[in-house]
Amino acid sequence: MKKNLTELVFILDRSGSMGGLEQDTIGGFNAMLTRQKEQEGEANVTTILFDHEVQLLHDRFPLKAVAPLTEKDYYVRGCTALLDAIGYGVEKMANIQRHLPESERAEKVIFVITTDGLENASKRFGYEKIRRMIEREKEQYGWEFLFLGANMDAVKEAARFGISSDRAVRFENDTQGVAVNYHVVSETVSRMREAPCCASIGAEWKEQIEADFQKRHHR
């Protein structure tokens, strides 16, 4: 196990319903990367974009070498192949960790999955297969998965593929909501990278996102 090395895997929705929030997403993602670069410790970044297709943007790039996201990288189109994106990411990272020498395997693996809509276009993976894959990596290797979903019951949806309620949150999919999302994700990933054990981070990480959503939907 390589101490102080974290594999960061970002799975970002770029389906058509994200239209109008491209600059917010790009700005939030880049600010998060800047914050992570300032932190001690090594990290590799894998970024997977998805609509009706899955695109690998960053393939375990050293964190400090990752260039800012641009409009050429992130543009919206199509439907939501959420399960295919998750399955691709988990399968890829598991294969890498399995075949690396023990001394080179990351101490921590953290997935951050962000979507503004429910699965509707996957062809390769289904809910049950994804659930088994995620639960295996969580239980055997301590991987962490954060799920941020808009326009849905995010806790209920996350449970369908093996992510517990304390790691799932619903957000408001607008400029303010996206900004809060990336601020909280950056803070949480930083805490997980610093912590002796990611599991020590409780459900409190998502309180700011929940408060933002509830404030705008208070009756």
Question: Which residues make up each language-model segment?
Answer:
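Acidic, low-complexity intrinsically disordered regions
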Residues: 1-219
